[in-house]
């Protein structure tokens, strides 16, 4: 298993990215391809380069966060994002992860890897944990701001496969994020999506509301990328706030007359806080392209990068992209639900 890592992307690059990658190589027993400035990688990786199965690919160009995604990909072919994605395309890497410009990573995946046949809108699937040790998948977490009903139906099928393979769920519960549980509530988008999901063979449980996310009512939470990204960032912000409370300790102490650590252990808050920490999962997987691409958070530290690499490893080992392709073919052949002819309706 070889994972390509962009060491140029992220607020704390390259030091934290390289640090996390080295930890991943040791813990997961995998090979790495580090993409970035060769001399910089040597400075931060040091003697580990001789001890671990690591290859360095020099990338003289860097895509910054404020660059236009498509222009950056076309104008900087020697950037880590372009080269890393190309390595996956060529079969020289099993997966690629980046904490850099998300739009550029998505654009590179679309143009270089291409979409799986039958998929119109690849989507970001983000694993979230609001209850201790009970993960769920939020899709789309930010790839598609504007969607049509058939897109959300497509996201549900992508998420269903990912939840089965990576989360280990036998029959994932699919919930449509809405402003009410009733079938007749919502926008034109959610109303029409509801009917598509209702007709599908998925384990569709109906609409779920925002508060249902923390109750783990659904295993796969389906929504458009605009809403999904707001939900994700809100949960991340809450997680950050709880982490700060946990670190301070005396804030809980004064309210409960207990040592903060004791209270956390008693009510299981520590496990919940850990689960809501975005660094615990590491990143979101781009589902629907021909390969494994993990988008890490821009403010990832070493732990997040290590966990993102672990997620990439699990995803690639399961062959999720190939299973998605097989699922589309089987549904098309059956002539029942999710026919790509219906999915590829012009926007």
Curated annotation (Swiss-Prot):
One of its GO terms (molecular function) is phosphate:acyl-[acyl carrier protein] acyltransferase activity. SUPFAM superfamilies: Isocitrate/Isopropylmalate dehydrogenase-like (SSF53659). Keywords: Cytoplasm, Lipid biosynthesis, Lipid metabolism, Phospholipid biosynthesis, Phospholipid metabolism, Transferase. Its main location: cytoplasm. Its EC number is 2.3.1.274. Pathway: Lipid metabolism; phospholipid metabolism. It catalyses: a fatty acyl-[ACP] + phosphate = an acyl phosphate + holo-[ACP]. It is found in: Cytoplasm. GO terms for biological process: fatty acid biosynthetic process; phospholipid biosynthetic process. One of its GO terms (cellular component) is cytoplasm. Gene3D superfamilies: Isopropylmalate Dehydrogenase. InterPro entries: FA_synthesis, Phospholipid_synth_PlsX-like. HAMAP family: PlsX. Belongs to the PlsX family. Homodimer. Probably interacts with PlsY. PANTHER family: FATTY ACID/PHOSPHOLIPID SYNTHESIS PROTEIN PLSX, PHOSPHATE ACYLTRANSFERASE. Catalyzes the reversible formation of acyl-phosphate (acyl-PO(4)) from acyl-[acyl-carrier-protein] (acyl-ACP). This enzyme utilizes acyl-ACP as fatty acyl donor, but not acyl-CoA. This is Phosphate acyltransferase. It comes from Dehalococcoides mccartyi (strain CBDB1). The gene is plsX.
């Amino acid at each position: 298993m070889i994972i390509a890592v962009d060491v140029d992307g992220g607020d704390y690059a390259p030091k934290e990215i390289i640090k996390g990658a080295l930890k991943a190589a040791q813990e997961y027993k995998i090979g790495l391809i580090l993409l970035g400035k060769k001399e910089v990688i040597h400075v931060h990786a040091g003697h580990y380069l001789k001890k671990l199965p690591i290859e360095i690919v020099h990338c003289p160009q860097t895509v910054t966060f404020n660059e236009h995604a498509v222009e950056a990909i076309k104008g900087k072919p020697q950037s880590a994002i372009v080269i890393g994605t190309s390595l996956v395309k060529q079969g020289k890497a099993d997966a690629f992860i980046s904490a850099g410009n998300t739009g550029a990573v998505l654009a590179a995946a679309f143009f270089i890897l291409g979409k799986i046949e039958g998929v119109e809108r690849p989507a970001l699937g983000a694993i979230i944990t609001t209850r201790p040790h009970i993960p769920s998948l939020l899709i789309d977490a930010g790839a598609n701001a504007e969607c049509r009903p058939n897109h959300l139906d497509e996201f549900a099928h992508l998420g269903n496969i990912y939840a089965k393979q990576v989360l280990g769920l036998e029959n994932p519960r699919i919930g449509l994020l809405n402003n009410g549980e009733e079938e007749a509530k919502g926008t034109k988008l959610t109303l029409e999506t509801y009917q598509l999901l209702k007709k599908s063979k998925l384990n569709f449980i109906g609409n779920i509301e925002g508060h249902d996310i923390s109750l783990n009512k659904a295993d796969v939470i389906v929504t458009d990328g605009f809403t999904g990204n707001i939900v994700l960032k809100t949960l991340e912000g809450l997680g950050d706030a709880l982490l700060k409370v946990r670190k301070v300790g005396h804030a809980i102490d004064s309210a409960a007359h207990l040592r903060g650590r004791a209270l956390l252990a008693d009510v299981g808050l520590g496990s919940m806080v850990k689960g809501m920490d975005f660094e615990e999962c590491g990143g979101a997987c781009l589902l629907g392209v021909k390969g494994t691409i993990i988008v890490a958070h821009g403010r990832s530290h070493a732990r997040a990068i290590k966990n993102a690499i672990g997620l990439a490893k699990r995803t690639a080992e399961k062959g999720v992209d190939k299973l998605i392709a097989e699922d589309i073919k089987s549904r098309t052949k059956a002539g029942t639900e999710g026919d790509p002819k219906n999915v590829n309706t012009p926007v």
